[in-house]
Amino acid sequence: MIAVVWQFDVRPGAGAEFEKLYGSDGTWTELSRRSRSFLGSSFLRDIGSETRYLLVEYWGEMMVYEKHLADFQKQIDALEQQRASLVERMEAVGVFTALDVPARAGPTWSQRSGRRVE
């Protein structure tokens, strides 16, 4: 299992719209759910900086994640254009081997089934 980690610095005042795009019910997450390898994601906002976010996506394997990116490139490009107006800076933190997976519950967790677990 892999964890793909992204960091975003969102433009002041754009947080709510950014959260709609990347949150557990957001368009980005809905697109990821189309892949059988997508296990879920955790979406986090920094306590010390309301414009800094992390997105951690969990995928079954790298090869299927890469196939997802290729298969949905057109939709991903459109979502990235939306994101560009909301984000000042984005950093691909990296792809990690997931040694321990969250309990898959809570307000930030989104899973493949399409429902958020509380």
PLM feature spans:
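Short, surface-exposed ligand-recognition loops at beta-strand->loop->(often short) alpha-helix junctions
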Residues: 9-22
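Acidic/histidine-enriched, glycine/proline-rich intrinsically disordered or flexible terminal extensions
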Residues: 94-118
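Serine/proline-rich low-complexity intrinsically disordered segments, especially terminal tails, linkers
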Residues: 34, 43-44, 112-115
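Solvent-exposed, flexible loop/coil residues
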Residues: 42, 47, 90, 100-103
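Intrinsically disordered, low-complexity segments enriched in small/polar residues
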Residues: 11-13, 38, 92, 104, ...
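Short, well-ordered beta-strand segments in beta-rich or mixed alpha/beta enzyme
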Residues: 2-9, 39-70
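An amphipathic, aromatic/His-enriched active-site/gating alpha helix that lines ligand/cofactor pockets
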Residues: 23-40, 58-96, 118
